[in-house]
Swiss-Prot record:
UniProt subcellular location: Secreted
InterPro entries: Leg1 (IPR008499)
Cleaved signal peptide residues: 1-22
Organism listed in the record: Danio rerio
Keyword Transmembrane helix: no
Record family assignment: Belongs to the LEG1 family.
Sites carrying sugar chains: 70
Top-level taxon: Eukaryota
The name this protein goes by in its record: Protein leg1a
Amino acid sequence: MSEMGFLRSVAAVLLLAVFSHAAVVTENGLPIQWGKAPSDLSHLPISDTGVQVNPWDYSQRMTMYKMLINATNAYMSSMGPGEQENPLWSLPLQLGWKLKSGRLADPTLDSSSTCGSEASDPVCISPLSWFACVNYYLSVLPFLAAVETGVVSSGGHQVLIQVPAEVAQDYCSSYSDCSTKHPNAMAKWHLFFQSLRQVSQSEDSDFNKKDSILGLMWAAEEESLQTASGACTERQKLYSSPEVSFQQSWLNSAAFVSAAHFHANIERSEKFMAPLPSRVLQEADSPPNIADLSTEENHTLYIFGWMNSVNQLLGGSLVNLWRKAMCSAQAREKGQALLHDLILDPKFPGSSLWSILSEMSTSC
């Protein structure tokens, strides 16, 4: 195979992997147990010091997402008609998959803890879970920033996040605490929520408003993931090598999604998110031949193996080319359409992807 042919094949494999990584588990088209999550803080414990939010309870973590989406819908008209167009939907959808796949449970071997056990304590989120730790930065941080900017109402109460004493050093518990420990991530979430009203009420076209809002959102999400990558890394020692490899691929894919300003509404999220493994991977698991996982799950894991190997081989040049090609709102719109064709149209010539990206990048 020629070098160009190899690169074209690699590009197709990598980008397919990127958008097949975040499987969505839904109930009636909405995130798992969405209807059970309270819609405002008045349903949570209130003390003299403020509202106590327990992010280690699945329902309360989902409450933060519900409040975020409900509060930002008014600023998302540029995304399209209907409340399912809000691009924040991908966050609670992914949380539902993490719950169902056992990735929010206590990962320690021979543990007496029942946290996350489907039989004993299914809605418990373990502070030792890697995915729960990463999701903390994609739920607690944006929620606190939304309250601080006034986008989400706290009913006049201070919002305090409960953190178990044994892991208190690993998690922040208030807006000021999070801003001190993670200033870059909090600043980008603050900017996102602070800019929503201004962008949505501007005289700009809906096309440009949409691109601006998505750009701000993905910049905040990517910064949160980068922050979480360092903060949660010790927890990866509790998992098998295949699971850690999968975790890293899941993290690294954010660069592709972010650069394209992907509009992650409910429909698009479900359409672009192919099946992820339905359980935590064990040391003996070797995709694509894991007997108790589906063909689709094995395929996704196999592609992730390719992604890691080829990214190392190319030294990150595919990510750089992708970012270079996504140089304008129009280019990013083309990029999303390109991903749609690549992934959802079996007749699409994936081998042409590299040349398409090269042409797009030179026209910037």
